[in-house]
Amino acid sequence: MRHLKTRLSFAVAAATAAVLATSPVIAQSAADVQKAVDAAYAKFKDLKEGKNADYIPALAKVDPNLFGIALVTVDGKVYTAGDIKTEVSIQSISKVFTMAQVIQEQGLDSIAKRIGVDATGARFNSIIAIEGVRSVVGTGAPEMNALVNPGAISSTSMVTGATADAVWAKIIGIHNDSAGRQLSVLQDVYKSESDSNQRNQAIGALMYAYGYIKTDWKQAVDLYTRQCSIGVNAKDLATMAATLASAGKNPVTGKVVVDPAKVPGILAVMATAGLYDDSGKWLYATGLPAKSGVGGGLIAVSPGKFGIAVIAPPLDDAGNSVKAQRAITAISNSLGGNPYAATPKS
């Protein structure tokens, strides 16, 4: 069964590769794209559902009314609405780009064999998930992925470097290149998370004990905490999403950040595990590879068309931004963003 699941995950990757090769650039006019973005902002601006994450004290203090939308097309056009300048911590969205760094350095199999590419069926910070897969470490098919905390901490540990600073330079580097500007850590969030990350420390110790982490697990947890504390605004996140939509090339700066051949595998993991327990529901509704963060950010990728991001801190029970899900769904529907939806030929 585990091998079947792995084959299915790579089948999703193959399908995504085909989409990347054939999808046209967004067909709507610039005015229509901006209209779709503005309409979503107006419709959901006053939505009061959800609440800020509070298990990290700094996140509970973020303005719950913060709401910004940005969309960046693969030809570099930028559309925005609301607050696109205020930074929040990137949180779990960083997992995508650290995973991309590992895949860029070591190939797709590095993640598939060490961590896995399957949904765990457990919470994103579950220790039970680690216990459930420890017996299959090294078999090539662990039931884990790099977008839940255990897999993400392992992924961070796989970034190569002689020192912690050297590893960090690579991690922040791929985030900078994807966003198209120099990003920095929000020190208040980093301190808050460092003071309250006992569960992640336990996860790191277990992952080391069971062979998922082969370096200093305390360093891996610290670097993971630091990457989750990177400050980003909605435009940064949309540009990062658009870099993946554009087969690894930042459409604003023109820099190739990720090998195009490796992007489909990254999108496949986002498609199956990007929104925690609600990943299947999200993919069923939108078809978009996506990743959320408990800081209130959400990115989604329409391969070959655009990347979109929303920042809105109040979360639902699964840990995903309520406004962001609604806004991205509405905009994607208006622009035909679902990569699985084809127009029948007459």
Located regions from the model:
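Bacterial N-terminal signal peptides that target proteins for export
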Residues: 1-13
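Bacterial N-terminal signal peptides
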Residues: 11-21
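Sec/Tat signal peptide C-region and signal peptidase I cleavage site
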Residues: 22-27
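Active-site-adjacent helix/loop patches that line small-molecule binding or acyl-intermediate pockets
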Residues: 29-33, 39-42, 47-49, 102-227
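A short, well-structured edge-of-sheet supersecondary motif
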Residues: 45-81, 297-300
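Active-site SXXK
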Residues: 75-76, 88-112, 240, 308
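Penicillin-binding protein/beta-lactamase superfamily catalytic region
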Residues: 165, 194-197, 202-266, 316-321
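Structured C-terminal helix/loop/strand segments within mature extracytoplasmic catalytic/sensor domains
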Residues: 246-346
